[in-house]
């Protein structure tokens, strides 16, 4: 089981060596993350710094990447940590920008690390973060873990650590405490992502891409309500690719006489990426076994029971290779359906869902009814 600790650091040169303690075990270090790594036997370490640390090391501001590399190389020497570093755009003194750019950067780059390392357990250490760093880093990493757990169908444990308050001169041991511990399942990860989106003002997602103000809440609603056929058939891969392209670029660093402007992407890009990242789990033709698996993994108890009941009904009929509406088998009259019917049947309205058999598997599809389905979401 692979584990990782993400730790926010304000000034890599600003911490004295102390003795940290966790559950009676002690470790001497200038930063808490080394104690956590050693005492909790964590596999991987990621240090999160702000770009404003460039002033600590007199780094040149030619561009973000070279400035970032200067910070990393110097920080490795001061912290004694040679592993991964994330240098995020932050607001501090002459560095100007928006705090949520810090959030978005950490979300995207921590997600990439989780994917690469195949992580099952995450520790977040906010002991040395300054200003908003600890809070936003924790929220960004939780969003990344939620999206990662959902798409990869993993349960991931997340633990938050911080220390007792300390002054400049520390003579006693400093205790590190587990402030919070939760388990994020594929379902709870999915729900966390959709909650972040569906509770925002509608105009929050304006101008990300064409019609994003309507499309993003609609996709989030479909995901939240278990409309797995819609998610599989309504191609959203271009939205994900555009967001990947935007978020993978370095922030823009623009020095002037008295300040340095740092520009990246707003929080809405992180939330939108998390949504389409999870949705990318659903693609291709959906057979009944696949639909049942989606319901078992990603649907709440009520939606799961509805979908499984509808699948059980469909399995009783002898299907052919010709696509026919479910209503023809169910002997249900009427050609239309509304929002109530769509959700009451777990996304399988009899007048809007085709079924057919191919190579011993029964498939369900919206076919030419998908636009009508979309209008009801």
Swiss-Prot record:
Query: What is its EC class?
Result: hydrolase
Q: What regulates this protein's activity?
A: The RNase activity is stimulated by cA4.
GO biological process per UniProt: defense response to virus
Cross-referenced CDD domains: Csx1_III-U
Q: Which GO terms describe its molecular function?
A: endonuclease activity
The record's listing under InterPro entries reads:
CRISPR-assoc_Csx1_C (IPR027419), CRISPR-assoc_prot_DxTHG_CS (IPR013383), CRISPR_assoc_ribonuclease (IPR052875), CRISPR_Csx1 (IPR010171), Csx1-like_HEPN (IPR019016), Csx1_CARF (IPR053857)
E.C. code: 3.1.-.-
What domain of life does the native source organism fall in?
Answer: Archaea
What's in the keyword line of the UniProt record? Antiviral defense, Endonuclease, Hydrolase, Nuclease
Entry's family note: Belongs to the CRISPR-associated Csx1 family.
Tell me how this protein assembles: Homodimer.
- Role of this protein: CRISPR (clustered regularly interspaced short palindromic repeat) is an adaptive immune system that provides protection against mobile genetic elements (viruses, transposable elements and conjugative plasmids). CRISPR clusters contain spacers, sequences complementary to antecedent mobile elements, and target invading nucleic acids. CRISPR clusters are transcribed and processed into CRISPR RNA (crRNA).
Output this protein's name: CRISPR system endoribonuclease Csx1
The gene name on file is csx1
